[in-house]
């Protein structure tokens, strides 16, 4: 498994980043920038469901604005996360493949989360872990949802404005 920093992109290496990005923060931007540096093309799947704190379409638009080199796709579903459930894994893989925007791949899956190795293996891709300990950008979306006012400095301007208007 690779660890960031990553070597410069090579032609025709499509990458995948998956997350809720609820809300997107500077740690997510660090991850996406690392994926864009490593891969020729990057698809970003924004998992979206009815219980999310920020609307999925808005999170998708923010990420597309902040990372114009990525193809950002909202994936609306009600799937839970259970890494021991084979049938559920298959549903996740079917969902991801159905939305894949490129002719082949992914060849690389980038994440800061532990599931990256298994997801990459199941997709036949290389797992790339980026700042798993969150030392480079010490923040998580959970921390922001719990105490938004304390972490406004970890949000890009459009996200910060929305959080201030809607959560504070």
Short names for language-model regions:
Residues 2-168:
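Nucleotidyltransferase catalytic core that binds NTPs
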């Amino acid at each position: 498994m690779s660890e960031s920093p990553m070597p410069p992109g090579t032609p025709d290496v499509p990458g995948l980043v998956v997350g809720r990005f609820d809300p997107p923060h500077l740690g997510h931007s660090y991850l996406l920038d690392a994926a864009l540096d490593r891969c020729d093309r990057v698809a970003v799947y924004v998992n979206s469901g009815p219980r999310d704190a920020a609307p999925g379409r808005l999170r998708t638009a923010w990420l597309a604005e902040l990372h114009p080199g990525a193809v950002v796709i909202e994936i609306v579903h009600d799937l839970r996360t259970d890494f021991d459930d084979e049938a559920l894994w298959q549903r996740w893989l079917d969902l991801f493949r159905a939305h894949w925007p490129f002719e082949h791949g992914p060849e690389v899956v980038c994440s800061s989360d532990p599931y990256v190795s298994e997801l990459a293996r199941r997709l036949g891709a290389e797992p790339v872990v980026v700042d798993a300990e969150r030392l480079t950008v010490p923040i998580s979306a959970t921390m922001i949802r719990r105490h938004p006012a304390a972490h406004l400095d970890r949000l890009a301007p459009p996200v910060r404005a929305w959080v201030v208007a809607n959560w504070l």
